[in-house]
């Protein structure tokens, strides 16, 4: 995939109407935004365009309204909070059909530096199907397109891809630029040793990532629920642990591929187990890889955590996607905590691949110790798989 995309500095935006696709898919509780990270992430691009005298038309989806207006998924709270953050009124164009009379009037009345926010793009059923009619309507409002929503870059929707068929100038904003820089470098030209850590529940979610990374990394660390499928592939007993029987053979192939490639594949050598999946279950540490009948693995053990931490500390580039255990249960969070600590203490380039690992790092207060926390869970996974992301591919090359 070509990561060398034109960014906003390369476009003359003064006096031009710029349609910016942001990711304002934020959690709401009774109309109040409970996590503002995505709004904060969008500010550098919006502020730059304001300073340069562009007319800024923001668009985003929120949740899954499935092609019809749902009041609880309106972007009104986002418009209000952005107005406070920017110290400037963000005009909210509240049209159920997104590009309606309110939007057209608001855009027509804009002065340089003004900001308009359109209603939730997924109020339109055409959005997720990337249908021409809605792409054209969105594009008709603007002269230039800027994509700054990495979280939806793996989706070919009207507001991420379709509009670029009608707006010939299409660039990335600062957020996507940063994602391309760190994830792109990690995948294409990492400083070595390069260590990747994969966790989470299922091997099936990470099949292509494992396969792609084995061609690139020096060390691959496996933890989380997916670790038990690998342990079974090595012939160990895993009790009642989560296992994907249909992926045991695949796991064996990956163990062989790692040997062939000279990749140091690290798998758990001890586990923290319990007799039930419950936050109050009593944790028991196994002596070795084997898990007894009636028990299930819920975290990597202390010996494993030490080996994993040492590997991280000797790395120059580290990419992490997926927790090491059931992080939500205090008794089974230690593996994830130890990995996060090792990354926080490291001088390496440390990249967190969005999703649960990003949440874990932020909860632990290590967020500011990481080089880069990706804003896209699904998008960063597809990036690590080596897939082309449609929302990036559609932008102008440098």
From Swiss-Prot:
Cystine pairings recorded for this chain: none
GO MF term set: ADP binding; ATP binding; phosphoglycerate kinase activity
Enzyme class: transferase
Pathway(s) it belongs to: Carbohydrate degradation; glycolysis; pyruvate from D-glyceraldehyde 3-phosphate: step 2/5
Residues engaged in binding substrate: 23-25, 38, 61-64, 122, 155
GO biological process, alphabetically ordered: gluconeogenesis; glycolytic process
Keyword annotations from UniProtKB, A to Z: ATP-binding, Cytoplasm, Glycolysis, Kinase, Nucleotide-binding, Transferase
Catalytic activity of the protein: (2R)-3-phosphoglycerate + ATP = (2R)-3-phospho-glyceroyl phosphate + ADP
Residues at which ATP binds: 206, 297, 328, 354-357
Subcellular location: Cytoplasm
Pfam families associated with the record: PGK (PF00162)
CDD domains noted in UniProt: Phosphoglycerate_kinase (cd00318)
Record InterPro entries: Phosphoglycerate_kinase (IPR001576), Phosphoglycerate_kinase_CS (IPR015911), Phosphoglycerate_kinase_N (IPR015824), Phosphoglycerate_kinase_sf (IPR036043)
EC annotation from Swiss-Prot or TrEMBL: 2.7.2.3
GO cellular component, one term: cytosol
HAMAP family to which the protein is assigned, alphabetical: Phosphoglyc_kinase (MF_00145)
Quaternary assembly: Monomer.
Similarity section: Belongs to the phosphoglycerate kinase family.
Name the record gives this protein: Phosphoglycerate kinase
Protein source organism: Clostridium botulinum (strain Kyoto / Type A2)
GN (gene name): pgk
